[in-house]
């Protein structure tokens, strides 16, 4: 709204000076015990939060629109505004209003955005709250995700990628980290596919920052965040322009919003080299790693099964483990050995669980300490957690595996923190420092003296009164109090002649005079000022304790990381024992051999007895398993089960099987299920083909590919042709030759076995009872050419008349098919004739000079197969 500022009151002028600096933010303007909003902000917030819109005199004829919230409960309102897409500028009083001369000084102390929240009650303990920054320049890119609430920072760099490859990589990283907020440079903002993905799938805002915000001139701000002197100290190559730019831009933004260049972060994890299994968005979604496809819930996901963690830090790390399986055998074996050692002693595992159960979120507590927003209960939680560390180290003392020994060495006892907080902070302190009663009696002599004044104020006045009676001989002398004069000595007129000369007359009343003395005035000042002085001194002592804890950041951060890792390993051990998992053998010979494998989620969510199945895949004779069988028979579950067992092994967890030998895979690809991407204007078939194309482009010999019903979104002949061509391409060792599970209802693919090297047929066993069938859920060797579609429809509950009609139509079609074969034998046009034409077409296009002997043999075999 337009406001004539010429007649505004001084305070309103001050408000507009702040608002002009933050025109796109809601300004929380501190007035006493409230944060007030004025004019447009007031109207907006009153509607958004359903607050009463009032008014305040502002120096103009009309009152300024105003709404307010108590400052002590501001967090919940801030979170609501952030969730609605607003950003909030906190404008605080920078001096005591009682001591201010004129208008109280105010300034913005913090800007709250979705990615810069640090308050524990505003965040999900089990999830990181990432803010991401993307910098793109001339085809190269760097993207960094930081969680200021935990001090976590992860950097990815991309060089020499094609535009589609870069787009795919960035979308995968953004979807995996699921940031609360994103910062782009202008060139990044021009990547329309990335922006469209964020708009339609992520539902989060993007801030396009100026190019100068990413300038190396901000490197000092970046290095202060890491308490470092150079880029080398934080593991960054200064010549990597994109990496330097994205880090400078991101941490400049963090410093600007937090109004502090605090050394909260200790390291940057860099991922320019290949250290983890790659899982794209499709694989993470189809395998339901952290949430279900249907309801987006944790229950029913792999994370739900594996999460027996006790700490918030462990929960966040577990999610990271699941989304980033290892590919280095030594690292995987270290985790598996650690889990095995933990499962070997149930008593120790139980005691570790009890100890971890009392550990608070060290990472987020330390963030609030570093940003000076920690409250008394935060420090107490830190101290209580510190007290648990000696117990945890003692329980790990006898462990022999290298990983657990390493973690034990990184857990610091933090005894100085627990001792200082234990001595200084009351056992049950108030949540707010201003409430008083935070510092223990006996910790600070001056504080004890002030508290004694408050406690014994009446006694002090009584002592002065008795002393003055005795000194002056005025028997009816008494000390009183009122708000105007404070404490005073009252003497009746009959004793005027005994009043000492040093008494200072303050008031005359009927039949009496009131006086003050220097001693009484000093006592009054001590009594009335003691409460205020207590709060000031408590704040100073609290700040000293907090700053001491801040000096221990490196120790606390290392301890937090080690405790989180231990928590995840204990969770793996607990789940493995409860669910009868086995330790997998990790191999590099290309073999996946699973005996009695089970789906980790389905077996826990079904009331039926789960039917285990074996799986064998290698890189030679059994690269591809073609799986046929009816719908609903369990093909998809079986394939997902295999993928999840491989993934569980590579995150270092035991697996649901009787035995498992797992060779490392570099990627898991999935093409499972059908879901129209309507928001992107893509049909089921288009999505399916895009996913298949991605697999054919990126799969390597070390990959695991899961394909379910490829080609079903188009005509039968098109579908069969596409499915066959895809299977042949993947199975061909000169093209990909990776381990593949291919479920299909195209029974024509059964013919691949024997014709294409490395293909083996499997099917789901079915038992037929007259017109009914029973799914045995057992995978057996050999293909089947009956999909039992009508029987499945009957099980699904289709009406009897529809089932009967379907049987009639099926009989007619089978009869026509038989007659067609007879007509073909009589010389009529048939599919065989079409095959002949196809053979001739292939031969016409073939140049024998381009064939090697091996190629010629393979080509001749294909021609023979076509003529059969």
Predicted features along the sequence, with ranges:
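Charged catalytic and DNA/RNA-contacting regions of genome-maintenance
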Residues: 1-341, 350, 354-370, 374-466
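Amphipathic alpha-helical transducer elements in NTP-driven molecular machines
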Residues: 8-12, 28, 39, 68-78, ...
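Beta-sheet entry/capping signal
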Residues: 25-28, 34, 85-89, 180-181, ...
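ATPase nucleotide-binding head domains, primarily ABC-like/P-loop NTPase cores
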Residues: 39-42, 240, 310-311, 321, ...
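Amphipathic heptad-repeat alpha-helical coiled-coil/stalk segments that mediate oligomerization
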Residues: 142, 214-225, 277-278, 289, ...
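Conserved nucleotide-binding/hydrolysis modules and their immediate coupling elements
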Residues: 469, 473-474
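Extended, charged coiled-coil "arm/hinge" scaffolds of SMC/Rad50-like chromosome-maintenance ATPases
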Residues: 509, 513-547
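Hydrophobic alpha-helical segments characteristic of transmembrane helices
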Residues: 550, 555-571
């Amino acid at each position: 709204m337009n406001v004539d500022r010429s007649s505004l009151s001084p305070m309103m002028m001050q408000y507009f000076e702040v608002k002009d600096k933050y025109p796109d933010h809601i300004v929380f303007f501190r007035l006493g015990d409230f944060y007030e909003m004025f004019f447009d902000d007031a109207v907006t917030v009153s509607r958004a939060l359903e607050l009463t819109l009032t008014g305040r005199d502002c120096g103009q004829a009309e009152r300024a629109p105003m709404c307010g919230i108590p400052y002590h409960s501001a967090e919940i309102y801030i979170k609501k505004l952030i969730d609605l897409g607003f950003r909030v500028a906190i404008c605080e009083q920078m001096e005591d209003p009682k001591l201010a001369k004129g208008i109280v000084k105010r300034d913005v102390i913090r800007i709250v955005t979705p990615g810069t929240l640090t308050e524990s009650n505003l965040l999900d303990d089990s999830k990181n709250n990432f803010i991401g920054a993307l910098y793109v320049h001339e085809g190269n890119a760097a993207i960094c995700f930081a969680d200021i609430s935990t001090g976590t920072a992860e950097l990815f760099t991309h060089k020499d990628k094609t535009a589609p490859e870069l787009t795919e990589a960035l979308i995968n990283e953004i979807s995996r980290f699921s940031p609360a907020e994103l910062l782009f440079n202008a060139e990044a903002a021009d990547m329309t596919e990335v922006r469209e993905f964020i708009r339609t799938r992520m539902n989060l805002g993007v801030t396009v920052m100026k190019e100068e915000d990413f300038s190396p001139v901000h490197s000092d701000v970046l290095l202060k965040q890491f308490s470092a002197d150079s880029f080398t100290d934080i593991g960054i190559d200064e010549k990597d322009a994109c990496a330097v730019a994205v880090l400078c831009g991101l941490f400049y933004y963090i410093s600007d919003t937090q109004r502090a260049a605090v050394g909260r972060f200790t390291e940057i994890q860099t991922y320019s080299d290949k250290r983890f299994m790659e899982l794209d968005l499709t694989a993470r979604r189809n395998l339901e790693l952290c949430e279900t496809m249907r309801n987006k819930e944790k229950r029913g996901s792999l994370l739900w099964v594996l999460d027996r963690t006790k700490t918030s830090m462990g929960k966040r790390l577990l999610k990271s483990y699941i989304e980033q399986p290892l590919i280095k055998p030594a690292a995987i074996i270290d985790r598996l050995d650690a889990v095995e050692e933990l499962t070997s002693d149930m008593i120790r595992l139980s005691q570790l669980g009890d100890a971890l159960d009392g550990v608070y979120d060290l990472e987020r507590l330390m963030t609030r300490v570093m940003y000076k927003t920690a409250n008394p209960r935060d420090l107490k939680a830190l101290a209580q957690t510190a007290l648990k560390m000696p117990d945890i180290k003692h329980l790990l003392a006898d462990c022999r595996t290298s990983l657990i020994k390493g973690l034990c060495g990184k857990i610091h006892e933090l005894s100085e923190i627990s001792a200082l907080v234990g001595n200084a902070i009351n056992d049950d302190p108030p949540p707010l420092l201003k409430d008083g009663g935070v510092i223990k009696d006996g910790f600070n002599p001056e504080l004890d003296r002030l508290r004694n004044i408050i406690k014994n104020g009446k006694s002090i006045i009584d002592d002065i009164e008795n002393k003055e009676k005795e000194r002056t001989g005025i028997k009816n002398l008494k000390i009183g109090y009122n708000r105007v004069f404070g404490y005073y000595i009252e003497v009746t007129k009959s004793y005027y002649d005994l009043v000492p000369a040093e008494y200072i007359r303050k008031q005359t009343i009927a039949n009496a005079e009131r006086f003050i003395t220097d001693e009484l005035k000093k006592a009054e000042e001590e009594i009335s000022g003691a409460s205020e002085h207590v709060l000031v001194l408590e704040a100073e002592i609290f700040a000293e304790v907090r700053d001491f804890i801040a000096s221990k950041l490196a120790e606390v951060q290392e301890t937090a990381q080690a405790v989180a890792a231990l928590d995840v390993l204990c969770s793996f051990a607990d789940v493995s024992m409860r669910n009868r998992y086995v330790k997998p053998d990790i191999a590099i010979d290309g073999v996946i051999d699973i005996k009695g494998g089970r789906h980790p989620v389905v077996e826990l969510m079904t009331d039926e007895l789960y039917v285990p199945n074996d799986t064998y895949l290698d890189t030679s004779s059994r690269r591809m398993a073609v799986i046929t069988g009816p719908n609903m028979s369990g093909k998809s579950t079986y394939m997902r089960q295999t993928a999840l067992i491989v993934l569980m092994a590579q995150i270092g967890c035991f697996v649901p099987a009787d035995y498992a030998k797992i060779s490392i895979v570099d990627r898991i690809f999935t093409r499972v299920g059908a879901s129209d991407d309507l928001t992107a204007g893509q049909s089921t078939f288009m999505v399916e083909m895009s996913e298949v194309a991605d697999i054919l482009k990126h799969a390597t010999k070390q990959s695991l590919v899961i394909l379910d019903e490829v080609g079903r979104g188009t005509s039968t002949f098109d579908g069969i042709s596409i499915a066959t061509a895809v299977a042949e391409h993947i199975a061909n060792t000169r093209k990909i030759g990776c381990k593949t599970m291919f479920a299909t209802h195209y029974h024509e693919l059964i013919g691949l076995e024997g014709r294409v090297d490395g293909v083996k047929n499997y099917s789901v066993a079915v038992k037929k009872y007259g017109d009914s069938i029973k799914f045995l859920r057992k995978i057996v060797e050999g293909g089947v050419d009956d999909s039992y579609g009508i029987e499945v429809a009957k099980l699904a509950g289709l009406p009897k008349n529809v089932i009967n009609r379907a049987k009639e139509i099926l009989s007619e079609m089978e009869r026509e098919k038989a007659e067609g074969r007879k007509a073909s034998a009589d010389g009529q046009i048939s599919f065989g004739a079409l095959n002949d034409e196809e053979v001739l077409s292939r031969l016409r296009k073939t140049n024998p000079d381009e064939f090697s002997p091996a190629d010629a043999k393979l080509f001749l075999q294909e021609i023979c197969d076509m003529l059969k």
